[in-house]
């Protein structure tokens, strides 16, 4: 049984928190507003969140950035951190180990910072709307990102997709991935790639790589081709 659930939204514009104000089961919504969230400095994110968030167990969605922030936040608060959780039963948290070949269950006594993998829990519906509290926070920014280069794509990220169609080196050439993209567009899937395909063809970006050295996925349907 859970206690009061507070949703904390890190943002540069407090209106970004309005979309979660009516989530079912939410007791309170806090928009933590800071310019630090416009950048990618995990230390700054953790500093700003720590200054504004109430005490208690904190849940993050498990992404590369949020897991970094989660670790730093836990260190600042002197509490446990558990990453990539796929099941929660009271104080017992289960997460995969050895590249998904086994699961471990740890028991947490007291508060913790927990990152939860995407698509392992059902989404919540809408309930009564909550007021959004706005907290201005400052972060201790130690690094500055000069440039972010991102591959332009309107496609789903493989780590968040319910359906993935993934190609390997047997596709023959990166041009043949267009066939996978056509299928993906039809069924609403993300397009992934094996490590061999990513290593062989520079046209296939690492952001598409699925597996131990790529992205961890949890789809309802996975189609491997080539």
Residue ranges of each PLM-predicted region?
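N-terminal glycine-rich FAD/FM-binding segment characteristic of electron-transfer flavoproteins
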Residues: 1-226
